Amino acid sequence: MPQMIVNPLDRFRMTSALATPRIIAASVGGPGAGKSRFWMTAPEPIVFQSLDWGMEGVVDKFQEDFAEANGRLKQIRVRDYDWAPTAEDEKQDGFQQEAVKMRNTFIVDFLIACEHARTVVWDKETDVWNLFRYAEFGKPKGDQARDFDKANQLMRKYINHPKKLTINFGLIQDVKDEWVSQNKKSGAVQRAGFREVPGLVHVDLWHDRREGKFFTLVGKARGAGAADVQDKEFENFTVPTLGMALFPETDVSDWK
């Protein structure tokens, strides 16, 4: 019997010229900048995991417009998490255990959403990162002298999870003031949340509202058409518009 020849490199996956047409992106911006509405334009079913309870007045208006144009509601589902700890909450016995319980529930919901939805959105990732820190370290600043490795690893694990699949994943991030010294603001803002997010996502988006109009600045981007959108600002941007720009071989039907 002839001996089978095994290529030692078969243990490594051969790459392909075909990219998976999906969006894994951070959406950064202040309140009312259109971040959530942008992700409502993504392929359905969509699941929002919301820790900021900011969907009221946004999703209902979107659904009203969508139903008028399509004769039905879009499959947008939301789970709200009651996570807004106060200084008094932090003093209560068992507070950290409550944070652990909520984090674990959030993770289970996330994995289920990833399995059954086409788009999953963390609204906001800024709050998810705070929840993970509370669960790991307790009250704020209890982590200053701690080892961040475990919390970092958990965030990396779940942010990277959708990359094994073909779903779209949005991480909405808030902004915070940039300080040049302890008592002086620079006047600029910076993203608030897990600091590794820009390196983990495929696309980095900055949202703004000016004179009642919504604008999206595309930063880092991956895809065959990335050069056509990087470092450019677009008005009333949508996920399908971004998707078709990054993956020119797709059309609008691929992003419904």
For every predicted segment, state its role:
Residues 1-10, 19-23, 212-256:
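C-terminal regions of RecA-like/P-loop NTPase motor modules
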